[in-house]
């Protein structure tokens, strides 16, 4: 199995990417990795070349670049070359912690959209209080969605949750303003009716306030709603941890309490740590394309590689394609 990784993407590239790749190579004996980027920078952190290949390029896509234009014009950019490795059949999947918009463009224009899928979806795995997490899609790939798009998201998310996350008969919920039938705008009502007859375990509407409680294993929404929900959850978590730290450091007594509580607080932090859940998968493409978090450290990159490997090994893309052929809803 071979995975191509954009070694120039992300806030901590290439160091985090190289260290994460070497960790994955040690963990998985069947894995081969191609690091795409400036060779000099990669070799600075590469202590072992076992099953690791470097594809040199000086060009990269910057966060300030217009995504579509950059992908079309910067043919030798590290992200584009990683996607090209997949298109050419040299790699089974690709990963980047670079620009989300550019990776979506590279996925569409280089890797290509899966037959029968109208719009790809960006899907991270979000943490829950029980540590199990849930898959949410879409969180920004397609802000103006149609009912058929959300129907396909539900099916793709269900396949992923079962194959990669090992959840038998995963619960699929529709993000809405209330849990009762008939709630929401016209899009939500139409999607609800479609999902009731879908080949999935649809549990109905779910509200954003209940997401962290693990009310569903897969949460479906349009890209605009999903992006707002995602950033609200991230912001709330950061604010809570910041306030907690401020209070625990406010006096000598509270500092003593913090020392006693530290093991429990670390458990809580680990439960809510996005780095353990891998990256956000771009569903609806011909091969796995994973968007790692922009601030990924080496552990986050390792988790994204582990996630990608599972998608390839468990044949997630062929399974989604097979299910869609059996359910050609238009």
UniProtKB/Swiss-Prot annotation:
Keywords of this entry: Cytoplasm, Lipid biosynthesis, Lipid metabolism, Phospholipid biosynthesis, Phospholipid metabolism, Transferase
What HAMAP family does its record include? PlsX (MF_00019)
The UniProt GO MF terms for this protein read: phosphate:acyl-[acyl carrier protein] acyltransferase activity
Q: What is this protein called?
A: Phosphate acyltransferase
What is the protein's quaternary organization? Homodimer. Probably interacts with PlsY.
Which Pfam family is an annotated match for this chain, by its short name? FA_synthesis
Taxonomic path = Bacteria, Bacillati, Bacillota, Bacilli, Bacillales
**Where does this protein reside within or beyond the cell?**
Cytoplasm
């Amino acid at each position: 199995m071979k995975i191509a990784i954009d070694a120039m993407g992300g806030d901590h590239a290439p160091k985090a990417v190289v260290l994460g790749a070497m960790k994955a190579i040690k963990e998985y004996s069947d894995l081969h990795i191609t690091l795409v980027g400036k060779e000099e920078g990669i070799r600075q952190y590469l202590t072992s070349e076992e099953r690791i290949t470097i594809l040199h390029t000086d060009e990269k896509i910057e966060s300030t670049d217009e995504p579509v234009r950059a992908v079309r014009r910067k043919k030798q950019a590290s992200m584009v070359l990683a996607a090209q490795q997949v298109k050419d059949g040299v790699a089974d999947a690709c990963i980047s912690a670079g620009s989300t918009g550019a990776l979506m463009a590279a996925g569409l224009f280089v890797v290509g959209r899966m037959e029968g899928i109208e719009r790809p979806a960006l899907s991270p795995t979000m943490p829950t209080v029980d540590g199990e997490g849930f898959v949410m899609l879409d969180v920004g790939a397609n802000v103006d969605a149609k009912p058929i798009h959300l129907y396909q998201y539900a099916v793709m998310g269900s396949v992923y949750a079962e194959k990669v996350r090992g959840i038998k008969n995963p619960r699929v919920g529709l993000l809405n303003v209330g849990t009762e039938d008939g709630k929401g705008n016209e899009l939500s009502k139409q999607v609800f009716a479609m999902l009731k007859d879908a080949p999935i375990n649809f549990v109905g509407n779910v509200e954003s306030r209940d997401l962290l409680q693990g009310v569903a294993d897969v949460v479906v929404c349009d890209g605009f709603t999903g992006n707002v929900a995602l950033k609200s959850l991230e912001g709330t978590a950061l604010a809570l941890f910041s306030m907690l730290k401020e209070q625990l450091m406010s006096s000598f007594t509270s500092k003593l309490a913090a020392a006693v509580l530290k093991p429990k607080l670390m458990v809580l932090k680990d439960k809510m740590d996005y780095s353990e859940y891998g990256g956000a998968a771009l569903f609806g493409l011909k091969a796995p394309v994973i968007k790692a978090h922009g601030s990924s450290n080496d552990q986050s990159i390792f988790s994204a590689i582990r996630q990608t490997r599972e998608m390839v090994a468990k044949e997630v893309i062929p399974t989604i394609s097979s299910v869609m052929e059996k359910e050609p809803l238009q």
